[in-house]
Amino acid sequence: MRLLALFFLALAGSASAQKAPYDVFPEAAPPYYRVRYEASDKPGELVYPVNYTVWVPPGVKALRGVIVHQHGCGEGSCKSGLTGAFDLHWQALAKKHDCALLAPSYEQPDKAECQMWCDPRNGSSAAFQKGLVDLGAQSGHPELSKVPWALWGHSGGGHWAGGMVLMHPERVAAAWLRSGVPLLEANPSRSTIKTHTVPETALSVPIMCNLGTKEGVTVKEGRFAGAWASNEAFFTAVRSRGGLIGVSVDPFTAHECGNQRYLAMPWLDACLTARLPETSGEPLKAMPAEKAWLAPLLGTEAAPAAKFSEDKTKAVWLPNEAIAKAWAQYVKDSAVTDTTPPPAPTKVKIKGNEITWEAGADLESGIASFTIERDGVAIGSVPEKSANPYGRPIFQGLQYSDTPVQPLVKMVFTDTKAEAGGKHTYRVIAVNTVGLQSK
């Protein structure tokens, strides 16, 4: 109780300061919806304010699920959640499966205890489910409160997503845990973290433990060097009981997300395709065991489960052949291949010398940029220069916790060299992150 009282004192003493950095975020106009809850001083409830933003695919008749993109700990990561629902690439995955895309932003103060939200038992599970009810009412999709969840989490968000699997396995279609997992055995050096138990029903939920090689796999020192020990312990405990769990190690990164989305998207796509019921309200379907592939832990080659000769209870589980091949490429150089061009931009409009358009992302490789042609000749690109310190260049930019940068990049180009009064034909071409162009 004393620890909880200290949290409330810290919050009360800095309440006015908590408007920043959480007070700057994109407008939520349909198909975006937002709810925000203040901090609670009631035992067991969420002690931090939280902002939930959801995107609902335009025209969807009935939602079949919700994809949750959960940030990590600390102010920098928490505020990055404010743009998560606006990510065009994650929207492409959601749209394919008639799912909503939801991104929380827990307003954790600087240096405050992350466990007070990233352990879902501390009120964030209940707040999340209340958010689904309220957002369902706002959007006209009350089924949002009942559909299955596909969870993605980074760092403390991985801890949260894994905890939600263990608390609500019947609701979770799949969970991708980037650099964070629930603790199953007490760690004396991290006494604020409470342990979880793994129920039998959680063993049928597909889980991927994903982390960087510099988080204790090959680099044994540094702030995040303990991540591998936690991931290995969680993987071993779940897999030894037959759980559907894998491990994928980014060969270049530390705690930053890097290029993980190019494996996470296909992996979640495969799991949602296999598990989502055709009719909303029906139970999740089981993963087809006959399609599974296995690989040695920290290995680089996978094989069909029926042909895997090593101990299967210690092997990385992969849902099918296509994902096994993408996984092998990812753990080698993170360059997951793609041979499909992105969708062509639509609703291209010219007003004076300003060109605007709309575009959806390529599910496999997202959007890197747009090329603008005037009369068949390229005259510029948006953005002019694409820089991403954490992985492939992305049109919307990429923050540490895998969300677009603010302010959101607009789909607009000004032709400053067009002849006044001249008639021109313009074309906008989408370019994905492997360099393929729309047709």
Annotate the PLM regions.
Residues 116-143:
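Alpha/beta-hydrolase active-site loop
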Residues 241-243, 251-346:
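Alpha/beta-hydrolase-fold serine-hydrolase catalytic core, especially in secreted/extracellular enzymes
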Residues 328-366, 420, 434-439:
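Pro/Thr/Ser/Gly-rich low-complexity, intrinsically disordered linker/stalk tracts
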Residues 369-421:
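Recognizes extended acidic, P/S/T-rich segments that occur
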